[in-house]
Design a protein with these regions (language model features):
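Domain-level detector of nuclease and nuclease-like folds
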Residues: 1-150
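Asp/Glu-rich intrinsically disordered low-complexity tracts
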Residues: 150, 154, 158, 162, ...
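Secondary-structure capping and domain/repeat boundary segments
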Residues: 179-192
Length: 192
């Protein structure tokens, strides 16, 4: 829509904003972070963590290609892939905007269609083991330290849980229908 049009292909960043969306939730302006002084797009706080986790996932999925991409956010190498000001910003965004139900639902829908998942949604804080303050700690499920509080314990836990339970089938396995394309729009089909 309109806000995405205003973003154009600007890098994400933080700004006081010379342009602000209705309500001031998203902004465009000169970057206020040390390390970059160009024009940036700052998304609504509600979505900053979403973008951070998407960008972390993109860097891991396309590690063999990202060095050749062009963006003011990128360091033109496969690791760390992003410039330090971007890493610091994305780590902060991921911490300050925890994984939401909307992200979990999107991750589940993507898995149904594409067969893959974003591990940064499934394991909040995983980015700390790759770019943050836990890079000297080998990630494993045993030492994984989630930034999300544990859910309320089951008042009647199963005394003999199945170590390999079958996943619960999705009650609504059909993906959301897609609207018909407008004239001139291209249609792409995802192949699993």
């Amino acid at each position: 829509g309109y806000v995405n049009n205003r973003r154009s292909n600007l890098p994400y960043g933080e700004t006081d904003g010379t342009w602000k969306s209705h309500g001031g939730f998203s902004k465009v302006g000169t970057c206020s972070l040390p390390g970059y002084s160009g024009k940036v797009f700052e998304p609504n706080d509600e979505y900053k963590g979403d973008f951070a986790r998407i960008y972390f996932y993109m860097a891991t999925c396309y590690e063999d290609k990202i060095a050749s991409w062009s963006s003011d956010m990128l360091s033109h190498n496969s690791y760390p892939a992003y410039k330090q000001w971007v890493i610091d910003m994305l780590l902060r965004w991921a911490k300050n905007d925890p994984v939401s139900k909307k992200e979990i639902d999107r991750n589940n829908a993507v898995q149904r269609v594409q067969g893959n998942r974003n591990p940064f949604v499934d394991y909040p804080g995983l980015e700390q083991y790759i770019w943050g303050n836990k890079t000297d700690v080998a990630f494993s499920y045993d030492n994984y330290d989630s930034t999300i509080p544990d859910p309320t314990p089951d008042p009647k836990p199963d005394p003999n849980p199945d170590p390999n339970p079958d996943p619960t089938p999705d009650p609504n396995p059909d993906p959301t229908p897609t609207p018909e394309p407008s004239e001139g729009e291209q249609v792409y089909t995802l192949v699993a």
